[in-house]
Amino acid sequence: MAEEEAKGLDYIPEIVLKKRKNRDELAFIRKKQLELGNSGKKKKKVSDIKRPEDFVHEFRAKEVDMIRMKQRVKRPKSSPPPVKSDLVFIIRIQGKNDMHPKTKRILNNLQLKSVFTGVFAKATDSLFQKLLKVQPYVTYGYPNDKSVKDLIYKKGCTIIEGNPVPLTDNNIIEQALGEHKILGIEDLVNEIARVGDHFREVMRFLGPLKLNKPVADVLHRKKQVFSEGGDTGNREDKINDLISKMN
């Protein structure tokens, strides 16, 4: 009897266990493909289907993102550098599935729903608090008049019926902002550059600016702040160099 129990506890080679694991994963993927096929959706590649451990990894990454956000906000810092301009230009440079929902909400609130989009904003304490919370995903600074003009002329658009429309016709601008004496693209540029009385109305009219993906070596894919050799955070007037390379 003891011999039979001993036989039941025979050692299972590691390679056999790995094959079982791979077989189970393949069965899971095939099940997902079958579910997608039955629902009438377009079939996905095997590589596109998430395995159970992928969901665990994504969940943990989101939790880490939230913890680090709280640490950035609570961390005592020296006095921040003085604000050099009333105008800030913000570029989203990172972030896909590894961010906490709160981070995503802040980025959406800033109209930065996609990587390599940029927006103008008025420099306020509230804005810088938001930027601190999403610091690993954005870089920002103070655009000069040339950068503002180049961005609006090359990338400026408004959203009409859900679609971006380039600002190639002054009539579009006049119809939307004529009551504020903004009659064309030059008036629009001036209102943004000096953060005029109707800056808020202009920002509601202006859609997010879709920038070009930077070439190699422009960004280092590092989440450290710019002042420490990374990509993120406040570049101050150095933002103009990045704008020229992405516009």
From Swiss-Prot:
Q: Keywords in UniProt for this one?
A: Ribonucleoprotein, Ribosomal protein
Keyword Ribonucleoprotein annotated: yes
Q: Which SUPFAM superfamilies match?
A: Ribosomal protein L30p/L7e
Q: Which GO terms describe its molecular function?
A: RNA binding; structural constituent of ribosome
Organism's domain of life? Answer: Eukaryota
One cellular component (GO) term of this entry: nucleolus
Which residues does UniProt call coiled coil?
Answer: none
Q: Which GO terms describe its biological process?
A: maturation of LSU-rRNA from tricistronic rRNA transcript (SSU-rRNA, 5.8S rRNA, LSU-rRNA)
InterPro entries attached to this UniProt entry = Ribo_uL30_ferredoxin-like_sf (IPR036919), Ribosomal_uL30 (IPR039699), Ribosomal_uL30_euk (IPR005998), Ribosomal_uL30_euk_arc (IPR035808), Ribosomal_uL30_ferredoxin-like (IPR016082), Ribosomal_uL30_N_euk (IPR012988)
Q: Which family does it belong to?
A: Belongs to the universal ribosomal protein uL30 family.
Report the protein name in the record: Large ribosomal subunit protein uL30z
This chain is encoded by the gene named RPL7A
